[in-house]
Amino acid sequence: FKKEDRSDLRCRQEQLAHFYESLLQYGMSVETPMPNSWREAFRLLRQLLENCGKRRKVVFLDELPWLAGPQSSELIAELGFFWNSWACKQRNIILVVCGSATSWMLDNVIREYGGLYSRLTMKMQLHPFTLGECEQYYKDRDFHFSRYEIALAYMALGGIPYYMDLLRNDRTLAENIDQIFFKNPQIKQEFEDVYMGLFSSSEKYVDIVVELGKHKYGMTRKEIADAVHTTSGGGLSTMLDNLQQSGIITTYPRLGGKRKVMVYQLVDFFSLFYLNYMHKHKTPTTGWGALQRSPQFFAWAGLTFEILVSQHIRQLQNALRIGTVTGMYNWRGMTDDGDGSQIDLVIEWHGERTDYLCEIKFSENVFAINADYKQALLDKISAFREDRK
């Protein structure tokens, strides 16, 4: 055996041992020998299920990418055979597989063209908490955050329960962020770990994300290809699709100046926070409370709040009593010298051939519109109407 072959074999034996222990936990005889292959493992699973009678049974394979190990083809092939040859014919069996490594699940399960091809009954993607759900989470756990602080926490951590669980209710939000990110970083390696866990060849994905982090309003496919020194071909398309499927980036049309371009924008809150404050030793020497008065904070907060709003479009629809939305995009009325008006969010509602123009501002206090600001808004509306003729 080569060194890597021995390593892969040892990994498979360890995963088979975990699988075997689970079968024992759910009633398999302790006299049953441990399987030496995934074919034997699924044969034992079938025997266990057959001995459980006719009641409804759920087979739940958690973290399938981890279970499969480096040589995943054997497990996937045997899982497909287990399902196609027997399990799919049993009306009382539900098979659930899940995994946090998004690209692996897409390539080996959802887009798999072998035994699992077109076998999925339902796909379920776990989404972060909404802003309202975060508010309820904090309320239930005796946090006394204002809505401004709840929004700020969301902009730093996203609606991810794992990150939210790091917060303590005996600290202010500023103290929590200092402790988690800066003073004693509990998630110092989280950025690298997240991408390594989600994607194979994670360094290529990180390169794309870092470049997108430098361009707050997104980049075209060609701009991304040039920045990461690759071609705008199938490999880049797959990576961009995987990033979008994971909720890390989004795509939207940018209209303006008589042209329409599709751009990719980084929208993962944790990645945005990390790249703005921690990437390449950016960690500030002052506390988070003092940092909130800096130009760096206002630049980050303004952009991130726009993303927060765009990710809560359904709640915005309800507040504005808008029906079905048919389009949503950023508009820039570019002039020849590159300057021009910008509208943060345009919501199209074709039910009444109406466009909602949204100016998004992040402010701790009520944002007052003075005469000059009002005129600037009216000028944007005029430029938008002229552009849409």
Model-predicted regions and their roles:
Residues 255, 262-389:
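A cross-kingdom feature that marks ATP-driven nucleic-acid transaction machinery
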